[in-house]
Amino acid sequence: MLVADLKQCHLEEACELFAATYRCQREAVPILDGSNASTERVLPMLKWCLEKHPGVAVFGSGKMIAYMTGFYIDEFLGVHKGALCLEWAHASTNQESFETHRLMYQALGQKWVDDGCLTHAVYFLNYAREAQDAFVWNGFGSICVDAVRAVEPIDVRAPEGVRIAAIQETDIAAWLPLVDGHNRHVARSPAFKPYLEPESPAELGDMLRRPGNLAWMAWHGNEAVAYMK
């Protein structure tokens, strides 16, 4: 296997690799939108990544069998500049996924560090277990898991005495201690997510007012006991 720089001329092949992985994921989760893996969607994003950020590819038997790129974010998950590789920014043929991702990160991770990125994060489709394992072997941990389900009623009731309602701006004073408590909790072992400063009422208010954002609170009597946003 040969590891080389990912170039613009490789990106249509890269889209095909991601589409193949996404099709396998859709077999397990059919409600996923098939258009998420279309070349029309993925190709412009990959082109944008390569305009200012590095990428690598792996070639075997005369064809590209894997690729990986990403983009940089200042103060990413803390005070340091970081690199983020989303689920469409990497893919590999399943037969060699562990080894190809290990080789790609060995090459690309060094480029990221050379560019001043000290925090590295990678998104995976759940199907790509061998790729995930390669990063676990390199010392990565899990910080977030997203789940997808059909939009339909859930047959469940709140416990007796518990009321669940959308959070209003008038609830921010009760909400703020829960947010801060959660942030302090994940800053401790074993997560160690950096805790820089408490979120402010103004920040939470801005979040609630942003179109498309939703947040819910569970109340036990007059006490706020849980939230989801």
Predicted regions and their residues:
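Conserved donor-binding loop and adjoining core beta-sheet/short helix segment
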Residues: 15, 21-103, 219-229
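Short loop/turn motifs at secondary-structure junctions and domain boundaries
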Residues: 46-50, 206-211
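Acidic, serine/threonine- and glycine-rich low-complexity intrinsically disordered segments
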Residues: 167, 176, 184-202, 206-209
